[in-house]
């Protein structure tokens, strides 16, 4: 069984009723520290914040490694040296990817950013939630 960190791009679609890809069960999903902060950033009020935070607690939380900033700097540099892709990849996605790599987890997403990361991080597992789901 692989644990999958849920990126906000896929999380929004799952909350709206999308079905996880074959082979990924809802019990396989987790969030990470930066993913939680990214999700809560969208809260519209204190009540909404508290409600969303409670909902997120249903997921296992994978903590960032102690060297996360060094890891993200290296990843950003590797992307910059690979056809200048660094400026197109949001910082939260870099933190999520490095947290996933640390835990040997994958990332379930619905955007292009993780495909770029996979180019410079062989072995990084990313699964895209397709539009039809």
Swiss-Prot record:
Known cofactor(s): Mg(2+)
Domain PINc: 30-118
InterPro entries hit by this protein: PIN-like_dom_sf, PIN_dom, Type_II_TA_system_RNase, VapC_family
Keyword Nuclease in record: yes
Keyword Metal-binding: yes
A Pfam family of this chain: PIN
Enzyme type, top EC level: hydrolase
Keywords: Hydrolase, Magnesium, Metal-binding, Nuclease, Toxin-antitoxin system
Residues that hold Mg(2+) according to the record: 7, 93
Gene Ontology MF annotations: magnesium ion binding; RNA nuclease activity
Gene3D superfamilies in the cross-refs: 5'-nuclease
Record-stated family: Belongs to the PINc/VapC protein family.
Family matches, as PANTHER family: RIBONUCLEASE VAPC2
General function of this protein: Toxic component of a type II toxin-antitoxin (TA) system. An RNase. The cognate antitoxin is VapB17.
HAMAP family named in the record: VapC_Nob1
Protein name according to UniProt: Ribonuclease VapC17
Species: Mycobacterium tuberculosis (strain CDC 1551 / Oshkosh)
């Amino acid at each position: 069984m692989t644990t999958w960190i849920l990126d906000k791009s896929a999380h929004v679609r799952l909350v709206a009723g999308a079905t996880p890809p074959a082979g990924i069960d809802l019990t396989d999903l987790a969030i990470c520290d930066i993913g939680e902060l990214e999700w809560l950033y969208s809260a519209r009020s204190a009540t909404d914040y508290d409600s969303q935070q409670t909902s997120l607690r249903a997921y296992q939380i994978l903590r960032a490694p102690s060297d996360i900033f060094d890891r993200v700097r290296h990843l950003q540099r590797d992307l910059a040296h690979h056809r200048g892709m660094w400026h197109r990849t949001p910082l939260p996605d870099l933190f999520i990817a490095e947290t996933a790599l640390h835990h040997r987890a994958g990332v379930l997403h619905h955007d292009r950013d993780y495909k770029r990361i996979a180019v410079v991080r062989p072995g990084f597992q990313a699964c895209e939630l397709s539009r039809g789901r």
